[in-house]
Amino acid sequence: MSWTIGRPGAEAPEDRMAASHLFTRLDDLVAWSRKHSLWPFNFGLSCCYVEMATALTPVYDQARFGAEVIRSTPRQADLLIVSGTVFRKMAVPLYRLYQQMREPRWVISMGACANSGGMYDIYSVVQGVDSFLPVDVYVPGCPPRPEALMEALVLLQSKIATEARPLQIRMGETGPARPFDPVPRRDALREGRMSVARLADPEST
């Protein structure tokens, strides 16, 4: 126990310290800053890019997520958003662009064609961008709405917040320890979809 001398009724030094200091772990602080300052690099290939470009308009206010500044070079980006049909000829340039991004880096696959090839089950289309890139978040739809991309950013932020990165100064170059989530998003939202009793025209709502 420590004693301090002060005037009666005056604020104690411990109270002043608690009001002016924030105590946290370094990993949590770094993860918090990373998830609120995503620098996206858009790679649009077909119709899904129109919806992705719509998400950048003031109507959806992507600045709320700290991802409003679109980078023109992969060397300044840490988030790659792949939207549209990925042909085999574009797979190699896309992989090279991903390799030019600095660590840590994340990938969002947007649309049915980027996720699984979509309706193009032919030799010239890559059947899922995850066959050569590590995808963090999948956005379903053909094409998905801008709100779906907003939800993908929120999911990616929650994933970044739980990533644990070792101290590279002491351990050398190592990758992040990413948590394993065995429950797909489709299964997590199934109960809410099954509880819908009234179906209506989307244009009427």
Curated annotation (Swiss-Prot):
Kinase: is it a keyword of this entry?
no
Q: What does this protein do?
A: NDH-1 shuttles electrons from NADH, via FMN and iron-sulfur (Fe-S) centers, to quinones in the respiratory chain. The immediate electron acceptor for the enzyme in this species is believed to be ubiquinone. Couples the redox reaction to proton translocation (for every two electrons transferred, four hydrogen ions are translocated across the cytoplasmic membrane), and thus conserves the redox energy in a proton gradient.
Q: What does the annotation say about its assembly with partners?
A: NDH-1 is composed of 14 different subunits. Subunits NuoB, C, D, E, F, and G constitute the peripheral sector of the complex.
Enzyme Commission code: 7.1.1.-
The EC category is translocase
Gene Ontology biological process terms, A to Z = aerobic respiration; electron transport coupled proton transport
Q: Which Pfam families does the entry link to?
A: Oxidored_q6
Main location per UniProt?
A: membrane
Organism phylogeny: Bacteria, Pseudomonadati, Pseudomonadota, Alphaproteobacteria, Rhodobacterales
Identification of the protein by name: NADH-quinone oxidoreductase subunit B 1
- List the catalysed reactions: a quinone + NADH + 5 H(+)(in) = a quinol + NAD(+) + 4 H(+)(out)
Provide the binding site for [4Fe-4S] cluster.
Answer: C47, C48, C113, C142
Keyword match Transit peptide:
no
What kind of membrane protein is this, topologically?
Peripheral membrane protein
Q: Organism source for this protein? A: Cereibacter sphaeroides (strain ATCC 17025 / ATH 2.4.3)
Q: Which SUPFAM superfamilies match?
A: HydA/Nqo6-like (SSF56770)
GO MF terms here are: 4 iron, 4 sulfur cluster binding; iron ion binding; NADH dehydrogenase (ubiquinone) activity; NADH:ubiquinone reductase (non-electrogenic) activity; quinone binding
Q: How is the cofactor bound?
A: Binds 1 [4Fe-4S] cluster.
Stretches for region Disordered: 171-205
Sequence ranges of Basic and acidic residues compositional bias: 183-193
